[in-house]
Amino acid sequence: MLIAQRPTLTEEPISEFRSKFILEPLEPGFGYTIGNSLRRTLLSSIPGAAVTSIRIEGVEHEFTTVPGVKEDVTEIILNLKGLVVSSEHDEPVLMYLRKQGPGVVTAADIAPPAGVEVHNPEMHIATLNSKGKLEMEMTVERGRGYVSAAQNKQPGQEIGRIPIDSIYSPVMRVTYKVEATRVEQRTDFDRLILDVWTKPAIRPRDAVASAGKTLVELFGLARELNVDAEGIDMGPSPTDAALAADLALPIEDLNLTVRSYNCLKREGIHTVGELVARTEQDLLDIRNFGAKSIEEVKQKLSDMGLALKDAQGGFDPGSAAGSYGSDHDQSYVETEQY
């Protein structure tokens, strides 16, 4: 089983509703795989709430005007598409707006029921003159993505009920880029930078967490085909600080002989953590790695209180995740013979 360094995810808040998320280091190619999957999921699959239909007192359809109101019904509907709401209810709920002119009608004039919140109360809806009056009923529903007014139209819908386009997604924009990052001597690992903008209804970190949960659930279906299938094991991070430091040491610090060092490096073993994840037979299978090299490695590990995986008190790969943490770049020439 291959052991990879456990990636870390950090958040860099830019504003209340914009954050950058940095995931590194990733195996080459995984930056684009994960970045594209997260972006598409964030934009299409995060649940939210939106107005799906309205009813205005004295209005039968959207192609008309309301006496005393500057904006026609089409303009009012266009403004309502920018309303940011959240709802705790799975079923549709009603909100009401009643305003007498003169004055400006904003989202702050809406009276939402318990469990529903308007997040942009400053949003402009309409302008009333001294004789103007606006009474409106809005239906709020939960959903995902975008639903057109035609899809929101219900069979047998009452006269005066006007369906509108609904933008449920609380995520406004997502971009990502992949940079190269260095892990010891290798410079081809991926660094994923995800930039997320959200509406006031949700924080970027909560949106990313929701997208991650959705993807885990979906990819879990593939894993269930064979729970014993081999893959890259990220391994849990050791909790003991001293042990974590020992496992992160580059094998250069073991002061091995030239032959042993070069054999391990060619096999892709760069840290003590990766070394203790191998069995004695794994090492014997390495070309030019003989019994004397095995004894040398076992002695060096014993001096640190560690052992190979199959030894008494040895380590399981799941708990010995390698961590590359050195810039050592030694090029040895094999001259010693066994």
Curated annotation (Swiss-Prot):
Its EC number is 2.7.7.6. Residues 241-338 are annotated as: Alpha C-terminal domain (alpha-CTD). InterPro entries: DNA-dir_RNA_pol_insert, DNA-dir_RNA_pol_RpoA/D/Rpb3, DNA-dir_RpoA, RBP11-like, RNAP_asu_C, RNApol_insert_sf. Belongs to the RNA polymerase alpha chain family. DNA-dependent RNA polymerase catalyzes the transcription of DNA into RNA using the four ribonucleoside triphosphates as substrates. The N-terminal domain is essential for RNAP assembly and basal transcription, whereas the C-terminal domain is involved in interaction with transcriptional regulators and with upstream promoter elements. This is DNA-directed RNA polymerase subunit alpha. It comes from Thermobifida fusca (strain YX). The gene is rpoA.
